[in-house]
Design a protein with these regions (language model features):
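Short, Lys/Arg-rich, polar N-terminal cytosolic tail immediately upstream
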Residues: 1-14
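Pair of pore-lining "gating" transmembrane helices in MFS-fold secondary transporters
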Residues: 20-42
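Alpha-helical transmembrane segments in multi-pass membrane proteins
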Residues: 24-28, 71, 75-79, 83, ...
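Hydrophobic core of transmembrane alpha-helices in multi-pass small-molecule transporters
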Residues: 26, 122-147
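Helix-to-loop junctions at the C-terminal end of transmembrane segments
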Residues: 82-92
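Cytoplasmic-side transmembrane-helix entry/capping segments in multi-pass membrane proteins
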Residues: 96-103
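C-terminal ends and interior cores of transmembrane alpha-helices
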Residues: 109-118
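Single conserved hydrophobic/aromatic residue that forms the stacking wall/gate
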Residues: 190-201
């Protein structure tokens, strides 16, 4: 059975257009680079690494260090819960859509982080970024009806490979379009990471 055709831009919600995701994944890449380069050498745009590091510390018997990783994971969980709870109440008022309100909130949140002193514990920024990255990941889920992530690139790599094979095997133009869309997301994530690294040097 053929996959449904990807909708044209004019038929999509603004928050589902590809350019929105291009901006959001650049922000997601910046989050990871920011906390890794400037705030303690950890990635806060996703949680896989935190659980791996927690397991490593448990294996070494460092219980205190292991338990620390529950803090960013809990912040990430809280961000998901809130971003599931709020949209229904905000959209019901029909003043502004949740995704629009979230972008304004995210900008204010990151702006406020800029006032955290350089000598403050890095955990403050780590937890704050975990929280907001989780909300972003949960709020922006698809572009042009293609499931996408805006804070990490693992799925984008898988989708590039999968759609490349579909395109080469059958000449499917839709698969080719999806492949290039995911490839664009990877490039933007890498570019924002590299830009943050150079700015911090």
């Amino acid at each position: 059975m053929k996959e449904k055709a990807v909708k044209k831009d004019e038929e999509l919600l603004e928050c589902e257009k590809l350019w929105i995701f291009a901006v959001m994944i650049a922000v997601g890449g910046f989050f990871g680079a920011y906390t890794y380069v400037q705030k303690g050498g950890v990635f806060c745009n996703a949680q896989t690494a935190n659980f791996v590091l927690m397991a490593v510390q448990l294996g070494r018997g460092n219980w205190r260090k292991a338990l620390y990783y529950l803090l960013p994971a809990s912040a990430y969980l809280l961000g998901t819960v809130i971003s599931e709870f709020l949209p229904k109440h905000i959209n019901r008022r029909k003043i502004v859509r949740w995704d629009t309100a979230f972008v304004a909130f995210e900008m204010a949140w990151i702006f406020a982080l800029g006032f955290v002193p350089d000598d403050a514990p890095p955990q403050i920024c780590q937890v704050a970024v975990n929280f907001i990255a989780s909300m972003q990941f949960n709020t922006f889920r698809q572009a042009k009806k293609i499931p996408m992530a805006t804070t990490f690139c693992t799925n984008h790599v898988r989708q590039v490979g999968s759609n490349l094979v579909k395109w080469l095997r059958s000449g499917n133009k839709e698969a080719r379009g999806k492949m290039f869309a995911h490839l664009l997301m990877i490039c933007l994530l890498y570019t924002s990471d590299a830009a943050d690294d150079r700015i911090s040097v």
